[in-house]
Amino acid sequence: MARLLNRWHLPALVRRHYSSRFQSLRIEKTQSPKPLPDSTELQFGRSFTGKYPSQTRNHILKLEWTTTQGWSDAQITPYDNLRLDPASCVLHYAFTCFEGMKAYKDPHGNARLFRPEENLARLNRSAARLALPTFEESGVLEFLAKYVDLEKRFIPHLPGHSLYLRPTLLGTDASISVSRPRSALLFVIASPMGDYFANGMKAVTLQATRSPVRAWPGGVGEFKVGGNYAPSIVPQEEAAEAGSQQNLWLLADRESGEEFVTEAGTMNLFVVWVSSSTGKKELVTPPLDGTILPGVTRMSILELARERLEGDRSGIEVVERRITMRELAAASKEGRLLEVFGAGTAVVVSPVRSIRWGDQCISCGLRDGEEAGPMSLQMKTWLEEVQYGLVEHPWR
């Protein structure tokens, strides 16, 4: 199975479908620039620089691809609707993958991207898995930087605010044949975003969900493809009806019956506990076994923790291993479960108060009146210090 999963990570697979090098970028600026939105009214994913709150336009970055011509020159044009043939393969077979990124403003008013090369590399891996064309990452990054520079006035110069970027690649081939697309479109849109926790962090409750399953061995759970997301909406609504804010996606082992933790909603999951075997404090997250999305925030938390916590007086060990629900329940009952939190681009860090698992409610270490534990707060602080340019770091 390892060979099956690892083959999608081979750089050669990504490079194989480079059809041309990018030549140039054409910029057509809008003649009716959109007014800046009220930062208090920003809604994640709904406040776009081209559509909100009026019908004036700003910009979209687009690159087209065909099997005969390869990648076209990049274009930044006034924001407008896409034009797709009703037979476009994306509409029938979900030939689409995407990324979530953010641009920030540093104390000097400069726009900053956080580890964009990691997002573009992941987008290429997703594209290769879906038989979509891959691209030269350095070229797209250059165009993306120019797009952000053009839209940077939409980045609120306020703590916790940013400009959310959505690079999307989709197959546009007008064919209902189930085959490799002969044409595709890569585009980027931007959405101003307020502080996810405008009134301070708020811990959530998760609903442990064994069925339906979000991802399985040999599937596409490790790729950011559109088909992974629509099927999660009904289970999320069911979790909300049961009093939880998100699902905790489980993967059950048929032989042992053990239920393994994978992701929390659309976030990677982290656990802070005292190990039952060593008595040491650990920061644990499930490994990248093909069912877990390799989140950029996840990777950054692991790197920061290893850089600043391991070997420190804190005595925390950073561990990537499978976690079972039985272990979580036992750690909570024995007072060893100190914190649980999710991590992702949109939310950065999201503390978890409890997990509903069957007829059990597993307490995740927070005291009454406490909305976040020390590790959650520390990781959020460290990440945002780098993202907003408040400290020197190689990721800059």
UniProtKB/Swiss-Prot annotation:
Q: Give the record's pathway.
A: Secondary metabolite biosynthesis
Task: State the EC number(s).
Answer: 2.6.1.-
Q: Which Pfam families match?
A: Aminotran_4
Extract the SUPFAM superfamilies matched here.
Answer: D-aminoacid aminotransferase-like PLP-dependent enzymes
Q: Which cofactor does it need?
A: pyridoxal 5'-phosphate
Q: Which UniProt keywords apply?
A: Amino-acid biosynthesis, Aminotransferase, Branched-chain amino acid biosynthesis, Pyridoxal phosphate, Transferase
Biological process according to GO:
L-leucine biosynthetic process; L-valine biosynthetic process
Report one GO cellular component. mitochondrion
Q: Residues where N6-(pyridoxal phosphate)lysine occurs?
A: 224
State the Gene Ontology terms under molecular function: branched-chain-amino-acid transaminase activity
Give residues annotated as binding pyridoxal 5'-phosphate: 122
What turns on expression?
Expression is positively regulated by the aspercryptin cluser-specific transcription factor atnN.
Q: Organism's domain of life?
A: Eukaryota
- What exactly does this protein do? Branched-chain-amino-acid aminotransferase; part of the gene cluster that mediates the biosynthesis of aspercryptins, linear lipopeptides built from six amino acids including 2 highly unusual and nonproteogenic amino acids, 2-amino-octanoic acid (2aoa) and 2-amino-dodecanol (2adol). The core structure of aspercryptins is as follows: Ser/Ala-Thr-Ile/Val-2aoa-Asn-2adol. The first step of aspercryptin biosynthesis is the generation of the fatty acid precursors, octanoic and dodecanoic acids, by the FAS subunits atnF and atnM.
Q: Which family does it belong to?
A: Belongs to the class-IV pyridoxal-phosphate-dependent aminotransferase family.
NCBIfam families xrefs: ilvE_II, PRK13357.1
Q: Which PANTHER family match?
A: BRANCHED-CHAIN-AMINO-ACID AMINOTRANSFERASE, SUBGROUP IIII AMINOTRANSFERASE
Q: What is this protein called?
A: Branched-chain-amino-acid aminotransferase atnH
Classification of source organism: Eukaryota, Fungi, Dikarya, Ascomycota, Pezizomycotina
Name of encoding gene: atnH
